[in-house]
Swiss-Prot record:
Known role: During stationary phase, converts 70S ribosomes to an inactive dimeric form (100S ribosomes).
Recorded name of the encoding gene: rmf
UniProt name for this protein: Ribosome modulation factor
InterPro entries: Ribosome_modulation_factor, RMF_sf
Classification lineage: Bacteria, Pseudomonadati, Pseudomonadota, Gammaproteobacteria, Aeromonadales
One Gene Ontology term from the biological process aspect of the record: regulation of translation
Key word Phosphoprotein present: no
Species assigned in the record: Tolumonas auensis (strain DSM 9187 / NBRC 110442 / TA 4)
Length: 58
């Protein structure tokens, strides 16, 4: 069960990262669960930071 939960949270982080790279607002987070929402926002923050520092090249 713990592995499944971790995988779900990692997927939330990945989806948040992708949303951040695409320039979407953090208000569009699809998760209601606090844990998943936190992971999604963490991924989103990482992507936004990388975009602002110029790491991502389209």
């Amino acid at each position: 069960m713990k592995r499944q939960k971790r995988d779900r949270l990692e997927r939330a982080r990945t989806k948040g990262y992708q949303a951040g790279l695409a320039g979407r607002s953090k208000e569009l987070c699809p998760y209601q669960c606090i844990d998943a929402r936190g992971y999604w926002l963490g991924g989103w923050r990482d992507a936004v930071d990388e975009r602002s520092q110029g790491y991502m090249v389209n």
